Amino acid sequence: MDHSESLTFNQLTQDYINKLKDAFQMLDEDEDGLISRGDLTKIYATLGKTLTDEEWSKMVPDNDTSTAEVGEEGVSFPIFLSIMGKNLSQFPEREELEESLKAIGRGHDLNVPLNEVIDSLKEAGFENPEEEFAKLFKLFTTNQQATEERTFRGKLFLDSITD
């Protein structure tokens, strides 16, 4: 897939569109066919957070022509697909991520010592990867009981972000 262009509907597999539809329906709290600010406010509240104007603006920028149909009422599914396609086209392919994890781990295994992942992220310009990626590390890291070394589970991570 060419990352210089946004994904179009015909570049998304039917399975992936179905996954995005499921995600859309989960976000559409009031089931009106739109993800509204009210829907997201409810979701944030269940997480103990408050949706700010700034966060809403970042999610649905007014100056983005692909979201011209977004108004006060919210985001329709076609616009949601467009937004997600644009965002997903910025991610590297699975093979690129696999090669990176193998290079970091100096082997063929996708499970990499967490300290090596953190060091590589620092070399790539992240100032505080432990904090910036804390949730990701919490989900995809295990402790090796024998050595007490923390291992980033790369295959599990890749399986969760690719279809």
From Swiss-Prot:
Single GO cellular component term: myosin II complex
Q: InterPro entries this protein is in?
A: EF-hand-dom_pair, EF_Hand_1_Ca_BS, EF_hand_dom, Myosin_RLC
Keywords for this protein: Calcium, Cell cycle, Cell division, Metal-binding, Motor protein, Myosin, Repeat
Chief place of localization: other
> Which ranges carry the EF-hand domain?
15-50, 92-127
Instruction: List localization entries.
Output: Bud neck
> Quaternary state and partners of this protein?
Interacts with the IQ domain of MYO1.
Q: What else is known?
A: Present with 1127 molecules/cell in log phase SD medium.
> In its UniProt entry, what is this protein called?
Myosin light chain 2
